[in-house]
């Protein structure tokens, strides 16, 4: 915590290393965030804003009526149903938006962009493939 409370200042011996590490981490997070948001916005029924000061994004998802009906038949909130299907199909964990007090009739999920940069393409591909299959199944 000391480093966060009092980071090295310009002129101190550790400043250059600290600044390079910090900028490298932040740059990587920005790149992963942009890549994920861009990919999510290409998916049917998903709208995702850029992350602002967080390590997650919170896309909205328009679920087909048949998916909503299947969720209700299973006794689950529609976004929970989607999140569980995603987990079971891909191993990817997202948090259903219904736990955050979303507006009635809207659906969201929260997902991070913390996987290593080298893994992001694979995560995005698995998520995109699942989403296309899910939408096709319930459309």
Cite the ranges covered by each PLM segment.
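PLP-dependent class I/II
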Residues: 1-139
């Amino acid at each position: 915590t000391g480093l966060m409370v009092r980071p090295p200042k310009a002129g101190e011996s550790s400043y250059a290393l600290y600044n390079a590490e910090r900028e490298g981490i932040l740059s990587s997070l920005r790149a992963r965030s942009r890549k994920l948001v861009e990919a999510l916005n290409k998916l049917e029924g998903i709208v995702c804003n850029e992350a602002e000061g967080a390590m997650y994004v919170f896309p909205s998802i328009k679920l087909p009526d048949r998916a909503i009906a299947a969720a209700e038949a299973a006794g689950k909130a529609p976004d929970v149903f989607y999140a569980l299907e995603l987990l079971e199909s891909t191993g990817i964990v997202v948090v259903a938006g219904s736990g955050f007090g979303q507006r009635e009739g809207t659906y969201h999920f929260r997902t991070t962009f913390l996987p290593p940069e080298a893994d992001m393409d694979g995560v995005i591909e698995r998520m995109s493939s699942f989403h296309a299959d899910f939408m096709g199944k319930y459309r």
